[in-house]
From Swiss-Prot:
Belongs to the HIPP family. The gene is HIPP06. Residues 23-86, 153-216 form the HMA domain. Changing residue 167 to G: Loss of metal binding. Changing residue 164 to G: Loss of metal binding. Heavy-metal-binding protein. Involved in the maintenance of heavy metal homeostasis and/or in detoxification. This is Heavy metal-associated isoprenylated plant protein 6. It comes from Arabidopsis thaliana.
Amino acid sequence: MGEKKEETATKPQGEKKPTDGGITTVVMKLDMHCEGCGKKIKRIFKHFKGVEDVKIDYKSNKLTVIGNVDPVEVRDKVADKIKRPVELVSTVAPPKKETPPSSGGAEKKPSPAAEEKPAEKKPAAVEKPGEKKEEKKKEEGEKKASPPPPPKESTVVLKTKLHCEGCEHKIKRIVNKIKGVNSVAIDSAKDLVIVKGIIDVKQLTPYLNEKLKRTVEVVPAKKDDGAPVAAAAAAPAGGEKKDKVAGEKKEIKDVGEKKVDGGGEKKKEVAVGGGGGGGGGGGDGGAMDVKKSEYNGYGYPPQPMYYYPEGQVYGQQHYMMQGQSSQSYVQEPYSNQGYVQESYMNQGYGQGYGQEAPPPPYMNQQGYADPYGHMRAPELFSDENPNGCSVM
């Protein structure tokens, strides 16, 4: 008998046998601009094993490959060549059934004892419903963790030199470009720049120093907005002062005279108001004690000019005839000054009165003015003359 030789044909591992499943239609979608793209794709499948036909639909940008091929391999090949994304439209072929490698001997069969013993099932762990609810709550709490609150808008006051309106426009333009800035206000009188928004002060100052080429300082904010609080506190304080002053005025109205020991002089309390006397009493006034002997009054009024009637003046007699004009020149001593006042009198024709003259002052028998008549007015609103007034 002849010996039978078993011939085993070995093939290289790189080669793949075409699937024995028959012809497969692979539809792919990709971008094709023109017929040149279609010709290039057809050249790709010219030497591809298993491909029988290639169809291209330019309107819908679809490529159809017919043959005994692997759809995934065809898609990767096209995408690699044209350098564009390729989408596989048709369903992928089912995977191949892998045959176990032949070991040369009879296949081992499982022992009948192993087949008879069914697989032992482990008891499932019993879970309590309360534990599940707690776990779900924890997971939901972690997911629904409140996000961090957004940063609050703040106001930053910067101090820098402002020379002119050009500087102000430049600073506004630079600051408005910073992210988070809402508004910019400039106080040129105090050289202040007020910036409102969500700002990082540590990064803002060096940035402005570099851009403006000048020093920019941050004015520290007062604690708890001290300015408004101070203003609010000042308002009631002012009201309290006004109430106190009003009460003092009411008390001062009941004026009482007191006798001073030894001198016998009388002292009277006078309320002297300040500020708003004629304007409706708006200002605050204070009360003070005024003595008649201590009140100096106002300055001396200007010395008036006097017209003297015809007759003797300083012992000199001037005779006038009717129808003749006369003039007399009189020197009067100014009280308490040490110099002499000169007055020029003009008398008209007839009786000597060419012009209406004011009433003559008090004259004594010698015909000259009383020097005591030129002294300063008595004390303002004194006891002797409560309605008197001095001419300023």
